């Protein structure tokens, strides 16, 4: 099973982890690391390295980050380039996190990356778009 390290600015990681646990329960091979305003790049690097050491990395590690180009993304990317079998996904939302935590057992790192990007795109929509899609595809009884 792929291991997941979730990281992001402020309380992003711990907040997403809390929401995930509320819906899916406790998950193995998963660590959330916040990057609060009082932290530093060096400290985040150390925390991510420690997380890698704690996880079973045999099947690979996926870093899920909040923002392209942000410190958590850059640090995760640097570490991933040093360790074969690592992937970095950015722009993480709750739908992506939930779906991919459930799917990761049967996926390689590359398959995870491709599926996560599709999931993230699918999860970003609007009420108008969903109502239009549902009007075309769904029987009246079904709803969104």
Enumerate the predicted regions with their spans.
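N-terminal loops that bind phosphate or other acidic moieties
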Residues: 1-144
């Amino acid at each position: 099973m792929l291991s997941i390290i979730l990281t992001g600015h402020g309380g992003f990681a711990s907040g997403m982890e809390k929401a995930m646990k509320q819906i899916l329960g406790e998950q193995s091979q998963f660590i959330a690391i916040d990057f609060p305003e009082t932290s530093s790049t060096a400290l985040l690097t150390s925390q991510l390295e420690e997380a890698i050491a704690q996880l079973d990395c045999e099947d690979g590690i996926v870093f899920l980050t909040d923002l392209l180009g942000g410190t958590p993304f850059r640090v995760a990317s640097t570490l991933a380039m040093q360790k074969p079998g690592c992937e970095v996904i950015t722009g993480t939302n709750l739908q992506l996190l939930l779906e991919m935590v459930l799917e990761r057992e049967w996926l390689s790192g590359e398959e995870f990356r491709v599926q996560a990007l599709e999931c993230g795109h699918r999860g970003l929509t609007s009420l108008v778009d969903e109502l239009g899609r549902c009007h075309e595809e769904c029987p009246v009884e079904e709803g969104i």
